[in-house]
């Protein structure tokens, strides 16, 4: 079993300290008196559960889909410019962005215009994920993370590959998100899955969320 999935209270305290350090960029970019986004100042609780993932549809300056994978007490995050595709022939650009707090996995709403990332955010998919083979932190460091998603919309094996021009630098980088060929792949599917536009947490459309209409999103529960 991946030792990142089971950790004691002492390790949880360490993870909280690491997460707070890694969230410094996230916090510096936001005025929490003007945005409803979580500040990420809650402690990381010990859990034996699988790692969580979320995909958020984000109508900012440009519409994109934010892929977030839980790792070491934060969400490692990528802005997938055209959204995920189940067609293995499609290589979707995924721009690495700052780490986000785990509480962001339940965020759905509007970010005020003028704030960083201003626009509407919808919980488009969520579930659990697992790395295939190599330790996920090591895989990310080498620029080749193979993983399996168990979501409400996305399933099966995927890979995030850091583009070669960005492999020798420590800066945030451009990656490619690619679906592996398996039983969940859909060749020729392209953007068909993206047409399914309701929130997995509230059922709301982007327009409903922007207008503040409809049900409050249901928080995700492990297990």
What do these predicted regions represent?
Residues 2-223:
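A charge-rich, low-complexity, intrinsically flexible signal that marks solvent-exposed coils, linkers
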């Amino acid at each position: 079993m991946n030792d990142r999935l089971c950790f004691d209270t002492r390790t949880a305290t360490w993870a909280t300290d690491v997460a707070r350090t890694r969230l410094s960029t996230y916090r510096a970019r936001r005025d929490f008196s003007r945005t409803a986004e979580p500040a990420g100042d809650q402690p990381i609780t010990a859990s034996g559960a699988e790692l969580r993932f979320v995909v958020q549809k984000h109508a900012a300056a440009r519409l994109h889909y934010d892929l977030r994978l839980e790792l070491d007490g934060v969400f490692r995050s990528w802005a997938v410019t055209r959204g995920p595709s189940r067609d293995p022939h499609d290589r979707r650009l995924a721009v690495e962005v700052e780490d986000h707090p785990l509480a962001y996995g339940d965020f759905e709403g509007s970010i005020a215009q003028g704030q960083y990332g201003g626009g509407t955010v919808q919980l488009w998919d969520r579930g659990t994920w697992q790395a295939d083979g190599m330790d996920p932190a090591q895989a990310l460091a080498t620029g080749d993370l193979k993983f399996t998603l168990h979501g409400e919309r996305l399933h099966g094996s995927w890979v995030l590959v850091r583009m070669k021009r960005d492999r020798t630098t420590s800066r945030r980088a451009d990656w490619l998100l690619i679906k592996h060929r398996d039983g969940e792949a859909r060749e020729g599917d392209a953007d068909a899955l993206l047409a399914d536009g309701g929130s997995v947490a509230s059922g709301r459309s982007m327009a409903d969320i922007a207008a503040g209409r409809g049900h409050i999103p249901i928080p995700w529960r492990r297990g």
